[in-house]
């Protein structure tokens, strides 16, 4: 019988086993990603888009790319902000009800007003060691913050000028893969089948952010872009009967552009939460309070009707409430991406 020498052979075996496990896990991840891919012949990309995007591998896709619709602007026609500047809240000129997206990383709080994001849709930023992208799709009223560190890449995102289900399709400048903004999934290109990490953020008012973070910083108005910041080109949109550039079915029992709160793969009608003020969904606590203007109502954003602020938090074992990722989007958007899933609060049996 062969006797193993502990001080050499056993550690080598353990290291080998660990490496095998890591490689196995990586292999499983690769298989999981590849399992989402369609056969290249069913990607159905148009020759026009292929010509405009020569560096995107459209043979790798997770959806039927014939679902893609042009939003009008070309690639980067809606320019992302890649070197954002910030100012102190005392230097900013916003009404208390002005809507913004806020994040807190490494103890530093920053705010991104929708009056700026509505014209740029993506801000590529970092705080300390955390690189992230703040994104907003006006046609879906969907705000999502993504981690930019992804595998071996630190991704920078731009706008394709394309939409799917009326939702922004982003691309990364490292691989030119296309990403669905609503869920952070790569739908075409080298990274197709992979998903971005969604980070906690809030969609709240200037007053609420200022009260929570008086020393926080706010995105400065870009000086190198000529846009009518503070004005929305989508005035009256969230009171419309039908969504723009959307061809899918609509949800039953609720208006297509009624707001819903999406958290933990559930959608709750905003009017249901507004009536209750507070709801418990498993380990998630949702609260609503008034004081935030809609960015898609009046031409002057700060004059938009009050749609209020939603906070989504999880109670940890020690009782502390921590923010979790959530979305406040439109009912048709939830239905487009989750056609078989109900919206809670629409009927009496969906409570």
Placement of each model-derived feature along the sequence:
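Bacterial N-terminal signal peptides
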Residues: 13-26
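Mid-to-C-terminal functional-domain signal that highlights helix-capping/loop sites
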Residues: 33-351
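N-terminal secretory signal peptides that target proteins for export/translocation
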Residues: 1-11
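Sec/Tat signal peptide C-region and signal peptidase I cleavage site
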Residues: 28-32
